[in-house]
From Swiss-Prot:
PROSITE patterns: AA_TRNA_LIGASE_II
Lineage, opening ranks: Archaea, Methanobacteriati, Methanobacteriota, Thermococci, Thermococcales
SUPFAM superfamilies cross-referenced by the UniProt entry: Class II aaRS and biotin synthetases, tRNA-binding arm
Keyword ATP-binding: yes
Gene name of the encoded protein: serS
HAMAP family: Ser_tRNA_synth_type1
Protein name, UniProt field: Serine--tRNA ligase
Catalytic activity: tRNA(Ser) + L-serine + ATP = L-seryl-tRNA(Ser) + AMP + diphosphate + H(+); tRNA(Sec) + L-serine + ATP = L-seryl-tRNA(Sec) + AMP + diphosphate + H(+)
Length: 455
């Protein structure tokens, strides 16, 4: 939510930002807010004047009573003032509702470094890491997507898609999951169960070492938390509701972590607060019909480890760089080639002022795919959830800044591992960083395991 003072004092800043975001239909909202706010402030001034007059009348009434003089005219005026105040306060309540309607639906103000664009095609790659395995048929596409800035090894054989690897390894049962739950669900099986849990523990250990407090949050939250953490559109497109209850299944641990300190004034000396949440995530994926319908890349349920930071406003941009760096460390340890992209205004969403994505090279698909999002939400969530801090007891509280980043979403990390670490024979060679967590160094195709057992 935006600060009404920003709109009141610098409406052109907000309008320019809406134009950059392509939200031109909301430009008239700013003029409407200014008009409503002007009327609200005029009414408030009248209310304060009337209260002052009423207090003066109370003094006069006291004096007249003491002197035994009539007070009927003063009482009549006092009662008129009470009614006038009630009417003005009622009018201001309605004005406030209208103002809040707009404020709650306006996007965050973007950082000056966010590129202007219309869609994900306008996102800007800013750095690359790793040596990609590239099938010769994907080479030209890879060079274009990596801007010629990434090392690569050309393969004469085409790596399998992760969905084919799942079948080869007997790592998942998608058909039975569809029978039981519908599309975009899966049974994870055998070594991939261990791999999923290993990825969670690996990411968790990395962040605990960096001072993050581990948290398993509630998997369901009340509506005010979701309204505070995200946009209203998500209630239709993303979030599952528990029927008959004021509860919603979380689409990410970010949301219960954002709500953790709702309506609190934090002690400034405790900032930054660093949390690493571990949870399942539940998503409708209503707006993604036809996309990634096979496999486990885009699903209704998955595990995720999430970084969440409450910081001072003046420190939040430094923390944004830190949390994306943390995520990069994790994918470097997993030996997954990737690029970091600066998300453009048209793909940014309403909540973040700036967002980085890590896109892993998927050797089977021949393209980069999103595996991490890291956002600085500045005070947009904090205003909605009323999360403030102060350094001294009598100091006026200020809103914190909130930041979040994926550490690892296990299903997508598994996709990246299966596509990048497979051999021509279909063996998956796990990165060394995971060995102590899995207890094994490779995953064999099912037919190889059967042959080993027979021998």
């Amino acid at each position: 939510m935006l600060d009404i003072k920003l709109i009141r004092e610098n409406p052109e800043i907000v309008k320019r930002d809406l134009i950059k975001r392509g939200e031109t239909e909301k430009l008239k909202w700013i003029d409407e807010i200014l008009e409503l706010d002007k009327k609200w402030r005029e009414n408030l001034k009248k209310i304060n004047q009337l209260r002052k007059e009423r207090n003066q009348l109370a003094v006069q009434i006291g004096k007249r009573k003491k002197a035994g003089e009539p007070i009927d005219d003063l009482l009549k005026r006092s009662n008129e003032i009470v009614k006038q105040i009630e009417e003005l306060e009622k009018e201001n309540e309605e004005l406030k509702k209208k103002i809040d309607y707009y404020l709650w639906r306006l996007p965050n103000i973007t950082h000056e470094s966010v590129p202007v664009g219309e869609s994900d095609e306008d996102n800007v790659p800013i750095r690359f890491w790793g040596k990609a395995k590239v099938w010769e048929g994907f080479l030209e596409t890879f060079k274009e997507q990596s801007l010629g800035k990434m090392e690569y090894e050309v393969l004469s054989w085409r790596p399998r898609l992760h969905v084919d690897m799942l079948e080869l390894l007997r790592g998942a049962d998608l058909e039975r999951a569809a029978k039981v739950s519908g599309a975009r669900f899966y049974y994870l099986l055998n070594e991939l169960v261990i791999l999923d849990l290993a990825l969670i523990r690996f990411a968790l250990d990395k962040l605990i070492e960096k001072g993050f407090t581990p948290v398993i949050p509630p998997y369901m939250v009340r509506r005010f938390v979701e309204e505070g953490a995200t946009t209203f559109d998500d209630f239709e497109d993303v979030i599952y509701k528990v029927e008959g209850e004021d509860l919603y299944l979380i689409p990410t641990a970010e949301h219960p972590l954002a709500g953790m300190h709702a309506n609190e004034i934090l002690d400034g000396k405790d900032l930054p607060l660093l949390y690493v949440g571990v949870s399942p995530c539940f998503r409708k994926e209503a707006g993604t019909a036809g996309k990634d319908t096979k496999g486990i890349f885009r699903v209704h349920q998955f595990h995720k480890v999430e970084q969440f930071v409450y910081s001072r406003p003046e420190e939040s941009w430094e923390w944004h760089e830190r949390i994306i760096a943390n995520a990069e460390e994790i994918f470097q340890a997993l030996e997954i080639p990737y690029r970091v992209v600066n998300i453009c205004t048209g793909d940014l969403g309403y909540v973040a002022a700036k967002k980085y994505d890590i896109e892993a090279w998927m050797a089977g698909q021949g393209k980069f795919r999103e595996v991490v999002s890291a956002s600085n939400c500045t005070d947009w969530q904090a205003r909605r959830l009323n999360i403030r801090f102060r350094d001294k007891t009598h100091e006026k509280p200020r809103f914190v800044h909130t930041l979040n980043s994926t550490a690892i979403a296990t299903s997508r990390a598994i996709v990246a591992i299966l596509e990048n670490h497979q051999t021509e024979e279909g063996v998956v060679k796990l990165p060394k960083a995971l060995w102590k967590y899995t207890g094994f160094k490779e995953i064999l195709p099912a037919h190889m395991k059967e042959k080993c057992c027979q021998d």
